[in-house]
């Protein structure tokens, strides 16, 4: 799995003594060699025994297992990350399936809620509104100079938990951990950022330990100007950056994406990443059953930016399979808390309006004005049901059984995060459909045993998509993230499905294979970027070489001392 980094050229390091031990990207702890301990003034600062990284990882894993709950395990892993990043990623790589739910969803949600209470050490940048005139200076203060990927949030819509203020920083930190662990992007290239624009969470404002700006959220023109000041400063500091918008509220997420997607290399993971992994899963599910997505009808519970983003990708795939735009949109039903979205409902957002059903199309449904999800199941007869509502338990037994009455093999994706917000549990879905439902979830669930059969539950996790996209963008030197690049990522993921390959098991690949999956997605993304003129054309073998050259591995390099 790991190559010998001692065969690579040494790194020339200007730090020594305690300063070196306190630099997470460079610290080796007990693995510093005798020569390095002498050359870098480390003698006497470390125990005598010199260890390998694997020995360190084994000790760290034993310590990890000694903690009794996932929150304590999360804090422990973050402490390792803040003291020795190479060891952190070696440990995470060795136990990715076990540790992913601890370092990211669902545990990261609780970590965001408790951010100010569990705060240990600074990581990333906190850009606060009162400091809006000094953003350029703050970017210069970043501990990492050659930044290639930024994940930024304003903390307003953290998972399904709402406004967490600067506690939302846990999400960029977690996401970038996955860029490295799953996509091989060096941690030296990754910078988490939170835009502190205040919070409307009264509990945080009243908390004496809350570390953010104690002020109601700014909005409107003030907010737009502040975000733009940040974007322009980033472009000046790192003009070739890949910037990922993360967990912005619905009223800001799509407008920000539309404003900046043609100005710099950026994407919104909640809208586009979620859409890409969901579409890849749906393509795989349809292929496994010998059908096309364009032959299916799809119902959504949740018509926010994430749900509508998924729906638009589904429409694009249906059109690629031969349907007209109108035909594809007629097969998609968006349901929000007021019922089915039709063209007669007032005050729709622009992205919702494009997906609303004309009332003429459903004129023969024997229903009232507010058409419920259950009525959509009965009269729309969808084959696919996707939940992005953030509200638990809304896929009721009656809803699911009504769907199953009209569809022998329903595809049901309750995608809301964290686990406490899921629309239905896989065990219930499988039981209510007598084992016929093909289920994928947003949070991790254990396999389900039903009538002597074991059902592996795929986690429709964005970590299958965004690390590969990031690796592909960096390897190709792409200047934009386009819809076609995202579509190529979805199709590449579908090709990696065990079910599509005729194998037993999950709809999505095993996390143990994530490096191979990310490399393949990266190559398809890079090739598409080149075809669209967003990257310089190079032969396939050069793309492969660039992907490998940019794929960082958690191994210690040899150090040589130099001066600043």
From Swiss-Prot:
GO molecular function per UniProt: malate dehydrogenase (decarboxylating) (NAD+) activity; metal ion binding; NAD binding; oxaloacetate decarboxylase activity
Residues marked Important for activity (site): 270
Cofactor requirement: Mg(2+); Mn(2+)
Domain of life: Bacteria
Active site: 104, 175
GO cellular component labels: cytosol
EC number: 1.1.1.38
Residues that coordinate or bind NAD(+): 157, 270, 417
Keywords: Metal-binding, NAD, Oxidoreductase
PROSITE patterns: MALIC_ENZYMES
GO biological process, one term: malate metabolic process
Catalysis: reaction(s): (S)-malate + NAD(+) = pyruvate + CO2 + NADH; oxaloacetate + H(+) = pyruvate + CO2
Textual note on the cofactor: Divalent metal cations. Prefers magnesium or manganese.
Residues the entry annotates as binding a divalent metal cation: 246-247, 270
Family (UniProt): Belongs to the malic enzymes family.
Subunit structure: Homotetramer.
Protein name: NAD-dependent malic enzyme
Gene name tied to this protein: maeA
């Amino acid at each position: 799995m790991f190559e010998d980094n001692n065969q690579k050229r040494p790194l020339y390091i200007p730090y020594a003594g305690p300063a070196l031990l306190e630099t997470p990207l460079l610290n080796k702890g007990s693995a510093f060699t005798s020569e390095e301990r002498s050359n870098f003034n480390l003698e006497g600062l470390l125990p005598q025994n010199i260890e390998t990284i694997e020995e360190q990882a084994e000790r760290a894993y034993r310590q990890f297992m000694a903690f009794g709950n996932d929150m304590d395990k999360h804090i422990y892993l973050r402490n390792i990350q803040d003291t020795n990043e190479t060891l952190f990623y070696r440990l995470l790589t060795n136990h990715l399936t076990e540790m992913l739910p601890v370092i990211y969803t669902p545990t990261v949600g609780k970590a965001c809620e408790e951010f100010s209470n569990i705060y240990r050490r600074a990581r990333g940048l906190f850009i606060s509104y009162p400091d809006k005139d000094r953003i350029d200076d703050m970017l210069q203060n970043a501990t990492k100079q050659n930044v290639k990927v930024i994940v930024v949030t304003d903390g307003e819509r953290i998972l399904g938990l709402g406004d967490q203020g600067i506690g939302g920083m846990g999400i960029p930190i977690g996401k970038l951990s996955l860029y490295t662990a799953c996509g091989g992007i060096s941690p030296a290239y990754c910078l988490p950022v939170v835009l502190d624009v205040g919070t409307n969470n009264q509990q945080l404002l009243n908390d004496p330990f809350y570390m953010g700006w104690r002020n109601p959220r700014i909005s409107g023109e003030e907010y737009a100007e502040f975000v733009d000041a940040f974007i322009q400063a980033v472009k000046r500091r790192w003009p070739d950056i890949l910037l990922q918008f993360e967990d912005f509220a619905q009223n800001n997420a799509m407008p920000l994406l539309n404003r900046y997607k043609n100005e710099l290399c950026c994407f919104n993971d909640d809208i586009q990443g979620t859409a890409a992994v969901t579409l890849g899963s749906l393509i795989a599910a349809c292929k496994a059953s010998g059908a096309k997505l364009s032959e299916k009808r799809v119902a959504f519970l949740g018509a926010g930016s994430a749900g509508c983003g998924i729906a638009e990708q589904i429409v694009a795939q249906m059109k690629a399979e031969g349907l007209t735009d109108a035909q594809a949109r007629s097969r998609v039903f968006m349901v929000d808390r007021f019922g089915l979205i039709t063209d007669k409902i007032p005050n729709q957002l622009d992205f919702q309006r494009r997906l609303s059903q004309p009332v003429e199309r459903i004129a023969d449904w024997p229903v009232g004005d507010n058409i419920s999800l259950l009525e959509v199941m009965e009269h729309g007869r969808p084959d696919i049901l996707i939940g992005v509502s953030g509200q638990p338990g809304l896929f009721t037994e009656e809803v699911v059984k009504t769907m199953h009455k009209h569809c022998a093999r329903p595809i049901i994706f309750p995608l809301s995060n964290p686990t406490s917000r899921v629309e239905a549990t896989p065990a219930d879905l499988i039981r209510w459909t007598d084992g016929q439902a093909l289920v994928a979830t947003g949070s991790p669930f254990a396999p389900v045993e039903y009538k002597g059969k074991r059902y592996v539950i795929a986690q429709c996790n964005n970590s299958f998509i965004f690390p590969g996209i990031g690796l592909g963008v960096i390897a190709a030197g792409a200047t934009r993230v386009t819809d076609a690049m995202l579509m190529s990522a979805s199709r590449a993921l579908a090709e990696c499905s065990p079910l599509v390959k005729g194998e037993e098991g999950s709809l999505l690949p095993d996390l143990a294979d994530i490096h191979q999956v990310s490399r393949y997605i990266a190559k398809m993304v890079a090739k598409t970027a080149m075809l669209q003129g967003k990257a310089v054309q190079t032969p396939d073998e050069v793309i492969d070489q660039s992907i490998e050259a940019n794929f960082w591995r958690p191994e210690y390099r040899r150090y040589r001392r130099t001066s600043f």
